[in-house]
């Protein structure tokens, strides 16, 4: 029988349109009807058979990177993540890659198999959702470019449900404690970089890589940002005058390790993955607690999507205060 059910899901059509000694055609389909239709068409039009696609999944990823991924801020990171997944899945041909294969891969990855480094064995569902999005984007983009003729094999695959990530911010006492440890550290640039992050909401990499050309009087302009848009943030006279004025090019040397060391000495505990990002969270949280405008905060942080900024809305002093004034019990209480 040329059309049969696939134990892993879906249907398989396998036939030899040019006889038993001719080339075999084997394709997977979501429904039996699609498989039968393909069988009928191929038998009736054997000469129209397309050349067999022997590209590996890795070759597709590399085609995507050359045509589109290279323009993305995290394009290389995506490419390397997909290369690793390709190796873990047994280096499949692109035509054999499907949702079942990726599902088995991510199940094992969640259990600590297929680790990319000895430092981190198990990965979070959020990380695997990113990898799913990466592969989907590859097939979507190559389809738009005419480099992939089939359907997106992951189009119906759902991402894992994840809890909203905990965001920690520092209190005034913790900020003072942290700045004190940074001041005592022997790295000459550490305290200044931390102050820039706390004063402007900058990402660590944006502050650490700051160049002289990005400074104007009482202003810092961040370039080459994650959102690919420049943004200018005002700073105090005190902070401006503390910045080096005798350097050309980059103002600070790398101090990530020094920050980790200073933070450890404070005893402040943070959720995983929020080592330097806590400074950005702290800026945003205090901005809203002090009555800041959410739209202004969006521009300062450089968020392209307001939903990212709305995570900080609950810090506003009057956040959801209307719930007290507009709930139905108010009318009943006032009528007594």
UniProtKB/Swiss-Prot annotation:
Residues 165-325 form the Tyr recombinase domain. PANTHER family: FELS-2 PROPHAGE PROTEIN, PHAGE INTEGRASE-RELATED. It comes from the Viruses. The keyword DNA-binding applies. GO terms for biological process: DNA integration; DNA recombination; establishment of integrated proviral latency; symbiont entry into host cell; viral genome integration into host DNA. Integrase is necessary for integration of the phage into the host genome by site-specific recombination. In conjunction with excisionase, integrase is also necessary for excision of the prophage from the host genome. The keyword DNA-binding applies. One of its GO terms (molecular function) is transferase activity. Residues 55-143 form the Core-binding (CB) domain. This is Integrase. CDD domains: INT_Rci_Hp1_C. Keywords: DNA integration, DNA recombination, DNA-binding, Hydrolase, Transferase, Viral genome integration, Virus entry into host cell. Belongs to the 'phage' integrase family. Its EC number is 2.7.7.-, 3.1.-.-. It comes from Escherichia phage 186. Gene3D superfamilies: Intergrase catalytic core (1.10.443.10). The active site is at residues 203, 226, 277, 280, 303, 312.
């Amino acid at each position: 029988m040329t059309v049969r059910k696939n134990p892993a899901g879906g249907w398989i059509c396998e036939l030899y349109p040019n006889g038993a000694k001719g080339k075999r055609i084997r394709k997977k389909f979501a429904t039996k009807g699609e498989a039968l239709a393909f069988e009928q068409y191929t038998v009736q039009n054997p000469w129209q058979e397309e050349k067999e696609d022997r590209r590996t999944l890795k070759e597709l990823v590399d085609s995507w990177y050359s045509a589109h991924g290279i323009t993305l801020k995290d394009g290389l990171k995506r490419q390397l993540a997909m290369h690793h997944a390709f190796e873990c899945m047994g280096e499949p041909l692109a035509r054999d890659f499907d949702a079942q294969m990726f599902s088995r891969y991510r199940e094992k990855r969640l259990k600590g198999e297929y680790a990319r480094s000895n430092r981190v064995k198990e990965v979070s569902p959020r990380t695997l959702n990113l990898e799913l999005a990466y592969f989907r984007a590859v097939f979507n983009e190559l389809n738009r470019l005419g480099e992939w003729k089939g359907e997106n094999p992951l189009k119906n695959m759902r991402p894992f449900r994840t809890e909203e990530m905990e965001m920690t911010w520092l209190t005034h006492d913790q900020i003072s404690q942290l700045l004190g440890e940074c001041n005592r550290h022997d790295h000459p640039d550490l305290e200044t970089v931390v102050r820039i992050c706390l004063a402007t909401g900058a990402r660590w990499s944006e502050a650490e890589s700051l160049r002289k050309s990005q400074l104007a009087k009482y202003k810092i302009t961040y370039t080459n940002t994650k959102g690919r848009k420049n943004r200018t943030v005002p700073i105090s006279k005190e902070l401006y005058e503390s910045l080096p004025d005798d350097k050309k090019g980059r103002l600070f040397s790398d101090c990530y390790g020094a920050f980790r060391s200073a933070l450890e000495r404070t005893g402040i505990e943070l959720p995983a993955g929020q080592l330097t990002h806590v400074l950005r969270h702290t800026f945003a949280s205090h901005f809203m607690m002090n009555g800041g405008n959410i739209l202004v905060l969006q521009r300062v942080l450089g968020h392209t999507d307001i939903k990212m900024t709305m995570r900080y809305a609950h810090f506003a002093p009057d956040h959801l205060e209307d719930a007290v004034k507009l709930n139905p019990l108010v009318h009943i209480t006032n009528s007594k």
